[in-house]
């Protein structure tokens, strides 16, 4: 039997790996800490394609100020180098996949296979 993945399922697999990774990193912080609350409350922004983030400001109860989604991402990524690595990898993979740059997409998968956690390894091997 041959398994065929379509575009939707590849992106779904990638975003689940990113979500699992975010949750694992989030669990290393105290539940009342700002990093934990930021990762928990703004998870949708972290999952979103960075090119599609809005420039509109909104009041973030987590940070207690008016802020743009891009600023939320920057502040949240500053809490964890590991999260920053996976976020940037996720965004680059999304970009190459959506732009149909299969050469760069598969090169990224091969280059980072040994550097990633089990959730991303599963995606890369599929």
Q: Locations of the language-model features?
A:
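Acidic/histidine-rich catalytic cores and adjacent linkers
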Residues: 1-2, 8-15, 31-126
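Short, surface-exposed amphipathic charged segments that create phosphate/polyanion-binding patches used
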Residues: 15-27
